[in-house]
Amino acid sequence: MDTKSKVFLHVQDFIGRSAIFFIAPFYFLLTRIFFYRVRDLREIRRQSTAEFAKHKGPWIICANHLTMVDSFLLGYATFSLRQHITGYKRLPWNLPERRNFQSNIILVVLCYLSKCIPVDRGGPREKLKKTLDKCVYLLRNGHHVMIFPEGGRSRSGRVNKEGFSYGVGRFVRDVENCKVMCIYMRGDKQHSYSVIPSWGDKFSAQIEVFTPEPIAETGLRAQREYAAQIINRLAQMEENYFALRRERCRGFEGFREREEKHGFALSEKNSHR
């Protein structure tokens, strides 16, 4: 990566660090306005904090992708407001698709201040290579990077195990002493992909530290194999999510049946009135 690009990254990092005192409270206010909630929020934050404390080096944070604000929601779920301000370096850099925000100057500014490196998906390979080079440079300097290995929002509403991107595989291959954190997060009302989650949605999140199996392949094959391992892990976490959701639903149905059995159903009339 050339010197000019490095300087621009450091300038962006400095400006973002200065603006976090305003940006972080604004984002947290948005979660209140949209009434978004995360199950076991304290435990999720405790778990992520503990993992970051165990490994002080770079992290690649890999998550499923269903809405255009997933990065924001993941940041809210894993870092408290205080951690946003006091632990700015631990906040991951994000890779949003440029065409999703480039036509709105407010979104452009917010993305710049929120540690975002725009990606031109489907654009020239040289341009994509420069973006990936920036991420590798950041990781080698102890920063964290958040990436959606699927390469875009899943149109089926499930982890895309076929058309995924190989970019995350390059990070695993090229950056030593780098840990991978897989996060599966989904709202109860999220049946497919969307621009933003439904108002008042409640999210479930799982965190797993994943160590990809070493492979003998090199070049693009190595990138693909590493990326496939991460995608498969996210798919397993997705199955766990739906299994837990079915269990919750069965528990609710059982509770309702017990209420009705003991005469507590709301639809029944009280014979003592």
Which sequence ranges carry the predicted segments?
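Membrane-anchoring hydrophobic helices of lipid-metabolizing enzymes
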Residues: M1-Q83, G87-L91, S103-V108, Y112-K115, ...
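Short, highly charged C-terminal tails/helix-capping segments
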Residues: H10, L244-N270
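Generic beta-sheet signal
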Residues: G57-A63, G142-P149, C178
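Cofactor-binding loop segments of dinucleotide-utilizing enzymes, especially the Rossmann-like FAD-
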Residues: N64, E97, E150, I183-M185
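Short internal beta-strands
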Residues: P92-R99
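Hydrophobic/aromatic beta-strand patches that form the interior of the parallel beta-sheet core
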Residues: L95, I117, K179-I183
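A cross-family acyltransferase "interaction/gating" segment
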Residues: I105-V108, H143-H144, R155-E225, F255
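A conditional alpha-helix N-cap/helix-loop micro-motif detector
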Residues: P124-K129, K161-E162
